[in-house]
């Protein structure tokens, strides 16, 4: 995470869930399939992504069908061979060079409360230490966003389509070849490096969002 200069990480959600994150360091990770299925049932909500963690994208001028005269022009093809299976924990990342950028109001769709992690390096360190002790091997990084109309090549769990860029996401990915619906573990209280607050969306910049008084619960 170092070269990306993340100053804060933010987890949006319901108060009861975020309290557990703050108080116990509860890391609740959803199966990748949750996000794929969510878009199918909620296409208007950008919380889900039908192409989540697919492994390749390619652009084609024309696709012709065998034994048919049918042709389709300008086609984008996504491929998934289940290279990436497992769990995701998603957060909003605030970078040192965009603290004056406005906080997108669509983030309210993720919940009316937020845990603001004031020391991202320490937070990730604690997760990695837990992972080492429990053979989980978490990978942590900001998400790279790509233009799906032009990009071709391999994909990985830290790449998403450009339409999701307002989420400014950093995520934790843990591989598991036979994942359950979710993975949940505790790293211990993070009250020393984080605060819980209720959101107030009044065209706040990231700086205003971070400096307004917290609402510890």
Where are these regions (language model features)?
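NAD-dependent ADP-ribosyltransferases
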Residues: 1-217
